[in-house]
């Protein structure tokens, strides 16, 4: 009789735990969905507006660039090398002069 009671108790315990977890998972999922909807409502328009104002891919410092179509980042400009790089035929992105 004791063994049957232990088995029944174990089965009831397992069922209680699995059903309880299912309820918690569905509650977490619905809460996550609500938070995502609220975030989309609050920040969706802002993200869409700022997406196009972001700087496109650009070339960093000391990287070859095209004189006619420079793709240097804002703080750089496409210049012909001077000094040690005078023998190179192409232009390079260099930091803009601050003066």
From Swiss-Prot:
Annotated S-S bridges: 58-73, 65-78, 72-93
Key words, A-Z: Amidation, Cleavage on pair of basic residues, Disulfide bond, Ion channel impairing toxin, Knottin, Neurotoxin, Secreted, Signal, Toxin, Voltage-gated sodium channel impairing toxin
Positions where Serine amide occurs in the chain: 98
InterPro entries reported in the protein's UniProt record: Toxin_22
One function term, GO molecular function aspect: toxin activity
GO CC terms, sorted: extracellular region
Propeptide: 23-57
Domain of life: Eukaryota
Keyword Lipoprotein attached: no
UniProt tissue specificity: Expressed by the venom gland.
Compartments reported by the entry: Secreted
Signal peptide range: 1-22
Record's function text: Has minor, but significant effects on the Para/tipE insect sodium channel.
UniProt domain comment: The presence of a 'disulfide through disulfide knot' structurally defines this protein as a knottin.
Family the entry assigns: Belongs to the neurotoxin 14 (magi-1) family. 08 (Ltx-4) subfamily.
Further facts: Negative results: has no effect of mammalian sodium channels Nav1.2/SCN2A, Nav1.4/SCN4A, Nav1.5/SCN5A, Nav1.6/SCN8A and potassium channels Kv1.3/KCNA3 and Shaker IR.
Record-given protein name: Omega-theraphotoxin-Bs2a
């Amino acid at each position: 009789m004791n063994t049957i009671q232990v088995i029944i108790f174990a089965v009831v315990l397992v069922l209680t735990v699995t059903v309880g977890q299912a309820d918690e998972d569905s509650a977490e999922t619905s809460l996550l969905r609500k938070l995502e909807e609220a975030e989309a409502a609050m920040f969706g328009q802002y993200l869409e507006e700022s997406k196009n104002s972001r700087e496109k891919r650009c070339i960093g410092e000391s990287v070859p660039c095209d004189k006619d179509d420079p793709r240097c980042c804002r703080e750089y400009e496409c210049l012909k090398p001077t000094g040690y790089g005078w023998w190179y035929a192409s232009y390079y992105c260099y930091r803009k002069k601050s003066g």
